[in-house]
């Protein structure tokens, strides 16, 4: 599996969560190109490839039901069929959808981290590169601050949601040591690859903090995609796979409480 547990801190890590940033046209061009390749390899209609193998449905603000009969989705597909330039049509359709710019249902935000209620007894973690001084939010010099963000977040969870909870996450960022060091080991130990082509935890790796495309990463991805002859292997074209993780909230209470009692930044000497 490409890129798992990679060291170092990539430049301009972007959001693992959806945010209100306006994404660049190149981000949509990339997904269209991927969908066209999927359609060729699989024999699927392009409409189905766009629904199942891109983030467009969510980016258009249509939720996560992925209903092929949704009126807005059908409007998009109708325009796509008639468009002289499918890339231009797709981006203009995105820009005129006000719901597409809306942030998810975040409960609370602490620095670069936030959380949302998932289902029942679950909360979901989100990360956004919120530092604005040009430094990486996941750099070693920010380790103490990121741990403080998470300690504050889980203090809020403990105070406002006293029932037993499961903490869940899904992101390409869990491949990176710079991100993994922020979380308890039992949580990381559950990491497993999930193949979900519809969601930002996969596609977000191609974006910087400003919503612009990472050109070098994108170029390498497209070169690998061009060489594929089977649908089974298209997921391997992505630089990083999405890892899903889950653990009891008590693991987080224990981990961040212990870090606060140790040296600054949660590191023992």
For each of these PLM feature ranges, what is it?
Residues 172-174:
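An acidic- and aromatic-residue-enriched active-site/binding cleft used to recognize and process polar
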Residues 137-156:
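Well-ordered, non-membrane alpha-helical segments in soluble/globular domains
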């Amino acid at each position: 599996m490409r890129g798992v547990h990679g060291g170092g801190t990539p430049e301009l890590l972007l959001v693992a969560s959806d945010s209100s940033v306006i994404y660049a046209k190149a981000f949509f061009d990339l997904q269209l190109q991927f969908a066209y390749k999927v359609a060729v390899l699989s024999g699927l209609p392009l409409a189905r490839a766009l629904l199942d193998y891109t983030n467009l449905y969510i980016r258009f603000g249509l939720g996560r039901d992925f209903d092929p009969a949704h009126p807005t989705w059908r409007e998009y597909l109708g325009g796509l069929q008639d468009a002289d330039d499918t890339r231009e049509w797709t981006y203009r359709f995105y820009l005129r959808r006000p719901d597409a710019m809306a942030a998810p249902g975040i409960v609370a935000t602490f620095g670069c981290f936030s959380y949302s209620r998932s289902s029942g007894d679950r909360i979901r973690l989100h990360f956004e590169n919120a530092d604005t001084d040009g430094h990486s939010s996941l750099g070693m010099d920010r380790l103490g601050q990121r741990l403080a963000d998470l300690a504050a977040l889980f203090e809020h969870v403990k105070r406002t949601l006293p029932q037993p909870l499961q903490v869940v996450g899904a992101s390409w960022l869990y491949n990176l040591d710079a991100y993994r060091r922020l979380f308890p080991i039992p949580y990381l130990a559950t990491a497993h690859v999930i193949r979900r082509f519809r969601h930002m935890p996969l596609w977000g790796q191609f974006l910087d903090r400003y919503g612009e495309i990472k050109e070098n990463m994108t170029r390498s991805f497209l070169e690998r995609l061009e060489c594929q002859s089977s649908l089974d292997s298209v997921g391997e074209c992505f630089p990083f796979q999405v890892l899903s993780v889950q653990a009891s909230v008590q693991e987080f209470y224990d981990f961040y409480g212990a870090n606060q009692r140790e040296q600054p930044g949660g590191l023992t000497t």
